[in-house]
């Protein structure tokens, strides 16, 4: 059943992927809002999938499928937090394709049930995995902000207005997003 919810989330993230490609050529507030609502709905489906997976008895949190799913969910969560703070959807151009790809790979097939030895401190293992993937998600967002910063800086130095990337915010905003993501990502990695 968690795979069904994950596939619903994948369909919603597909709208975000289309937005990412559409935003490269022109900006549209209507399409941006539709993509944000679809991504929010996808996050709800994704969260339900992760909760059902967590409540099942045979879950292996360190598996590739679950790791990709968790990283995609946290990356989208960080994107939504950045959107709530800065009111810019430009990092979505990088984040949406990454989240879609990770969710797509995780939703391809049911994960095989692995027989593992009983872990005595299961709570510590889950906390460790969640903290590591939180750090990874923050670094994914920092990577996206860094790419956007380089593109915007090159555009401003060329002094040619380009309609292709006119949706990017000011360099200071992109720099703050990247810096704060790094500031959050590295401590969670350690």
What spans do the regions from the language model cover?
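Polytopic transmembrane helical bundles with strong interfacial aromatic enrichment
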Residues: 1-57, 61-190
């Amino acid at each position: 059943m968690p795979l069904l919810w994950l596939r619903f989330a994948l369909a919603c993230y597909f709208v975000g992927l289309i937005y990412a490609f559409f935003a490269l050529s022109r900006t549209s507030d209507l399409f941006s809002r539709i993509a944000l609502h679809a991504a929010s709905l996808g996050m709800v489906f994704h969260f339900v999938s992760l909760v059902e997976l967590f409540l099942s008895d045979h879950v292996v949190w360190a598996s590739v499928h679950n790791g990709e799913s968790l990283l995609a969910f946290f990356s989208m969560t960080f994107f939504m937090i950045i959107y709530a703070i800065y009111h810019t959807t430009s990092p979505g151009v990088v984040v949406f394709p990454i989240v879609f790809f990770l969710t797509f790979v995780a939703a391809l097939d049911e994960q095989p049930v692995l027989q593992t030895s009983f872990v005595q401190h299961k709570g510590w293992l889950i906390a460790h995995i969640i903290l590591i993937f939180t750090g990874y998600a923050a670094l994914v967002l920092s990577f996206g902000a860094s790419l956007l910063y380089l593109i915007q800086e090159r555009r401003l130095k060329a002094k040619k207005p380009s309609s292709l990337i006119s949706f990017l915010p000011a360099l200071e905003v992109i720099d703050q997003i990247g810096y704060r993501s790094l500031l959050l990502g590295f401590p969670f990695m350690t």
